[in-house]
Amino acid sequence: ASDGKANLHQGAVGVGLCLRTGRALRAVQFGNPLRHHPDTGLDLYDLKVPHWDTLLTLAASCYEMSGLGYIGTDMVLDKFRGPMLLELNARPGLAIQIANGRGLVPNLKTIEKLGQVKMNVEQRVNFAKDHFGIFDE
């Protein structure tokens, strides 16, 4: 199992998610495909992240907090407080691309084509869902 590791390069389980729905698309550990959680045996493809829209809104609001154009957000779902921001990463790991099954370059090119268009948090969330969601339903 991941032995409590939170980073993919250290052995954490990574689950690629559809940005539109929060449903699992695929999973990896140590860069290899994985279907079942190594500790619980649960089918990772059955995962649907609760509070998905709140998590996306929280992540999209980090732009104003940080002023950075590209960041990684680490979030947790607290039993009592719900979605919470754990940390921001100015240089997030890129191994999640393996779990997502697609690279970032096409997404970044789509964003670059926008130029200096200003969007509020809700518009950014909707843009990401519409352009980067993998339509799994």
Per-range role (PLM):
Residues 36-54, 64, 77-137:
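C-terminal active-site "lid" helix and adjoining low-complexity regulatory extension at the edge
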Residues 3-78:
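A long amphipathic alpha-helix within ATP-dependent nucleotide-binding catalytic cores
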